[in-house]
Regions:
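Active-site neighborhood of HAD-like aspartate-dependent phosphohydrolases
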Residues: 1-45, 68-69
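Generic enzyme active-site microenvironment
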Residues: 10-12, 112, 161-162
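Conserved Rossmann-like nucleotide-cofactor binding loop
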Residues: 16, 23, 117-118, 167, ...
Length: 231
């Protein structure tokens, strides 16, 4: 039986709980060392093409296309192992797991992420986040379009959405209104992009890093209004 909660906390993964910019930097270093700068650049060109087509980052799908251009290079066959066996747990932000534990005293914490059906679940599992969230994991293509499904699995009177992308936070705020409190950890390249910061409305709560969520009292998530900064 599904329980109606007073409050549910929804967490993004990449650059919210886990330093995905560092993962990409490590991948770029591996590609440059293994294949050279030119082919490294080509991988990321394909990556962006695939992202535009699908609407999410697809590292393994990019690898499939990269392989077609390097069919006779057996080193390509090792790339999937590098990706799938990457030590994602080493990239969890300091204080992230404590922050998740902190908010769970008031309601369940749920991962709400975008991505493919293989690599993104592997990242969540291998990083230890799947266990930290007790298996409460939702991964979509466009999560901001799946709020009805979120409500079906985790019905609540109010939600808190923690994400490094203001576009996502703005879209969810427009859909749920005062039922959601948006939290913006200023981590990763999207959170520092001047154009993005100028284009979208600020979140209800802004954090310099995800660990600061542990400083937030319950009232920060349940009171009307916004504009708070912590600590």
């Amino acid at each position: 039986m599904i329980t109606m909660h007073s409050l549910v906390f929804l967490f993004d993964v990449d650059n919210t709980l886990l330093d995905n910019d560092r993962v990409q930097a490590d991948l770029a270093e591996y590609l440059s060392r293994t294949f050279g700068v030119r082919d490294c650049g080509r991988y990321w060109e394909i990556f962006e093409d695939v992202r535009r087509e699908l609407g999410y980052a697809d590292y393994l799908g990019t690898l499939e296309r990269f392989r077609l251009e390097n069919m006779h290079d057996p080193r390509v066959l090792l790339m999937s192992s590098w990706l799938m066996d990457y030590p994602f747990g080493d990239r969890i932000y300091k204080g992230a797991l404590s922050a998740v534990q902190h908010v769970q005293q008031w309601g369940p914490a749920v991962i709400l992420s975008d991505g493919d059906a293989v690599f993104q679940p592997r990242k969540v599992d291998r990083s230890g986040l799947w266990a930290a969230f007790n298996g409460r994991v939702l991964i979509y293509i466009h999560k901001e379009q799946e709020l009805a499904d979120v409500e079906r699995f985790y019905p609540a009177k109010r939600y808190v959405m923690i994400d490094d992308k203001l576009r996502i936070l703005n879209t969810i705020k427009n859909s749920w209104g005062e039922r959601v409190k948006t939290v913006f950890p200023k981590q990763g390249h999207y959170a520092r992009d001047p154009h993005i910061l100028a284009t979208y409305q600020p979140a209800d709560i802004q954090l310099d890093q995800i660990g600061e969520l542990s400083n937030c009292p319950l009232a920060a998530f349940t009171s009307n209004g916004g504009g708070a900064n912590f600590p």
